[in-house]
């Protein structure tokens, strides 16, 4: 569900490798802004802040990540409590405590000679058609592969 950062939840080594662990996506799919934080990085070069429509991830993130882009929660997202894991029933409430929380959506890191790139954008394949997201995705993968 959270892709690379939601795999192998029981593996601390994996979490240290990827630099984050997916927690949730309050409000499901909705509009939010992506803010470019490292405009001078080759992955982000020429990309300005942009609006995005998808799941806005809340994650536990390693402070050693080199954050390339973030999103900020508005605090009006709706969070639905699961009465049982995987259940769609439960109480819903507004996430006021998240107001102003800045969450990384793209980062890179190095471990030894290895390079790791992560982007939380792209819940559906058609999101790769979003011009800014597509550039970040491609450039990040190229950076990690060299």
Please report, for each region that a protein language model flagged, where it lies by residue:
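Catalytic cores of NTP-dependent nucleotidyl/adenyl transfer enzymes across multiple folds
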Residues: 122
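Extended active-site neighborhood of metal-dependent phosphoesterases/phosphodiesterases
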Residues: 5-21
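C-terminal alpha-helix
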Residues: 139-146
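Stable alpha-helical elements in mature extracytoplasmic
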Residues: 10, 39, 43, 133-137
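A short acidic/glycine-rich loop-to-helix N-cap element
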Residues: 125-134
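Phosphate-centric recognition/catalysis
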Residues: 119
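Short alpha-beta junction capping motif
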Residues: 1-7, 113
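Catalytic beta-strand/loop cores that center a nucleophilic Ser/Cys/Thr
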Residues: 20-112
């Amino acid at each position: 569900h959270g892709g690379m950062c939601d795999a192998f939840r029981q593996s601390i080594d994996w979490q240290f490798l990827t630099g984050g662990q997916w927690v949730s996506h309050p409000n499901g799919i909705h509009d939010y802004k992506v803010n470019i934080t490292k405009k001078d990085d080759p992955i982000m070069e020429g990309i300005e802040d942009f609006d995005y429509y998808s799941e806005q991830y809340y994650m536990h993130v390693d402070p050693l990540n080199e954050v390339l882009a973030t999103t900020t929660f508005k605090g009006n997202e709706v969070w639905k409590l699961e009465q049982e894991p995987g259940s769609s029933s439960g109480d819903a409430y507004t996430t006021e405590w998240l107001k102003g929380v800045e969450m990384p959506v793209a980062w890179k890191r190095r471990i030894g000679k290895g390079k790791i790139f992560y982007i939380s954008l792209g819940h559906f394949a058609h999101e790769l058609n979003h011009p800014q997201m597509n550039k970040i995705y491609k450039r990040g993968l190229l950076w990690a592969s060299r």
